[in-house]
Amino acid sequence: MGMRMMVTVFLLGVLATTVVSLRSNRASDGRRGIVNKLNDLVPQYWTECCGRIGPHCSRCICPEVVCPKNG
């Protein structure tokens, strides 16, 4: 397998895990519960994006205390 294929398979696995995990949640958990679950799955992504808005972080994904206002 090439590197690109391995990355694609990894991302699809993360996506599938996220969908299954989110389906088992109740809607009352809200956005914070979803972010916490994703943070457990892909911690390096959220570390890079936390506290700023960039090409991989098109919207604010952190608590309001550390996340700058968009616009």
From Swiss-Prot:
PTM (free text): Contains 3 disulfide bonds. They are not indicated here, since framework IV presents two different connectivities (I-V, II-III, IV-VI and I-III, II-V, IV-VI).
Propeptide stretches in the record: 22-37
Coiled-coil spans in chain: none
Chain positions found as Asparagine amide: N70
Protein name: Conotoxin Bu23
Listed GO CC annotations: extracellular region
Keyword line: Amidation, Disulfide bond, Ion channel impairing toxin, Neurotoxin, Secreted, Signal, Toxin
